[in-house]
Amino acid sequence: MAVTMEYEKDVKVAALDGKKIAVIGYGSQGHAHAQNLRDTGHDVIIGVRPGKSFDKAKEDGFDTYTVAEAAKLADVIMILAPDEIQQDLYEAEIAPNLEAGNAVGFAHGFNIHFEFIKVPADVDVFMCAPKGPGHLVRRTFEEGFGVPALYAVYQDATGNAKDIAMDWCKGVGSARVGLLETTYKEETEEDLFGEQAVLCGGLTALIEAGFEVLTEAGYAPELAYFEVLHEMKLIVDLIYEGGFKKMRQSISNTAEYGDYVSGPRVITEQVKENMKAVLADIQNGKFANDFVDDYKAGRPKLTAYREQAANLEIEKVGAELRKAMPFVGKNDDDAFKIYN
């Protein structure tokens, strides 16, 4: 189904004017939404549990409260805490403080679509989902443009939910570059599939498999790292800028010919069938329930997966090589933890 890109001129109603806005969570998306909205003249407070994020929000000049206090004070509440903690946070601290006519927003449809969170019928539920990480949402805003966003309405109690969603997207800078209307179902299922089958799960598995094929055939791990991981950014940047066409115009004829001949040998019809199975587990709620169950059990699976990933040879080789390549960027773990 074709969709129409919308821009600032299409945001007809200043639905957030005069509203007290509470951003719940001050992590990757939270700090960006809050700062951008404040810079566009909105009345923003922060609701977050005590800790680094609480301290960072105060340092950045926000009136900062507990989640319950912020929810009680606000007309519009945007929940930007991690997906897995949102249900407990909502039930314990937000739901008891909601009033008829309030609006509750999300940047991802996970908890609403899979019904971990159920909002009263007299409260609006909307979405503003910028298609980029929080630091990029903030940086591009400061540069005078923004990151494209999806917006959606799940529940329109007041008749104003769409206006609130669009005005929120305008406030964070996304309407400068383009908005696409979607649904909670579509955003949630497509986002999870993209992460799992292509952007995160599929990509890292492909890189790891390529590295293992080369090293198992006797090639030097350091050279294998450059061939299958380091150069990935160069190719992805070309695709990002101009699609497959620009990438293929920019590489050698040898590489282009190999692309056409060998790509389908790697990504076969069986791989597509595996992707369909991944999508099915997303659609039927299996993935969501497994993820939440693991969180409630203390994250044993996620912890084990992280330990396994940290011990991969490609990670160890890459860590050593990057020490000699300061141009690839500094890994500031402390800042990353504050904003995640």
UniProtKB/Swiss-Prot annotation:
Gene3D superfamilies for this protein: 6.10.240.10, NAD(P)-binding Rossmann-like Domain
GO biological process: isoleucine biosynthetic process; L-valine biosynthetic process
Binding site for Mg(2+) 1: 191, 195
Reactions it catalyzes: (2R)-2,3-dihydroxy-3-methylbutanoate + NADP(+) = (2S)-2-acetolactate + NADPH + H(+); (2R,3R)-2,3-dihydroxy-3-methylpentanoate + NADP(+) = (S)-2-ethyl-2-hydroxy-3-oxobutanoate + NADPH + H(+)
Disulfide bonds, paired cysteine numbers: none
Keyword presence, Oxidoreductase: yes
Pathway: Amino-acid biosynthesis; L-isoleucine biosynthesis; L-isoleucine from 2-oxobutanoate: step 2/4; Amino-acid biosynthesis; L-valine biosynthesis; L-valine from pyruvate: step 2/4
GO cellular component: cytosol
Cofactor note: Binds 2 magnesium ions per subunit.
Active site: 108
Residues annotated to bind NADP(+): 26-29, 49, 53, 83-86, 134
Chain ranges of the KARI C-terminal knotted domain: 183-328
Annotated family: Belongs to the ketol-acid reductoisomerase family.
Known function: Involved in the biosynthesis of branched-chain amino acids (BCAA). Catalyzes an alkyl-migration followed by a ketol-acid reduction of (S)-2-acetolactate (S2AL) to yield (R)-2,3-dihydroxy-isovalerate. In the isomerase reaction, S2AL is rearranged via a Mg-dependent methyl migration to produce 3-hydroxy-3-methyl-2-ketobutyrate (HMKB). In the reductase reaction, this 2-ketoacid undergoes a metal-dependent reduction by NADPH to yield (R)-2,3-dihydroxy-isovalerate.
Protein name per UniProt: Ketol-acid reductoisomerase (NADP(+))
The organism of origin for this protein: Streptococcus sanguinis (strain SK36)
Gene that specifies this protein: ilvC
